[in-house]
UniProtKB/Swiss-Prot annotation:
Belongs to the GlpE family. This is Thiosulfate sulfurtransferase GlpE. Residues 17-105 form the Rhodanese domain. It comes from the Bacteria. InterPro entries: GlpE_sulfurtransferase, Rhodanese-like_dom, Rhodanese-like_dom_sf, Thiosulf_sulfurTrfase. The lineage of its organism: Bacteria, Pseudomonadati, Pseudomonadota, Gammaproteobacteria, Vibrionales. It is found in: Cytoplasm.
Amino acid sequence: MDHFLHIDVNAAQAMMEQKQAHLVDIRDPQSFQLAHAKNAYHLTNQSMVQFMEQAEFDQPVLVMCYHGISSQGAAQYLVNQGFEEVYSVDGGFEAWHRANLPIEAS
């Protein structure tokens, strides 16, 4: 795969349930701590190496940001690092929350 793909929040949730996809949230620490999608990994510049050491490069990775814009750059970065199946979650956490999908809140 040379480029990331787009996925809507409902398809992302279904993929997490079916394929053991990794959901990574690239929002700022305060936003992530306040609320994030259930089982999301907070991917930052500081946690990138740890994520890459733990993740399987052939498992799907779903990238979430605020509204689905910033996640596109991060998704392409992960493709460039060798991840085989990477998706940008359209609408980001905003759409996830509006769809009443599972979240974890502080």
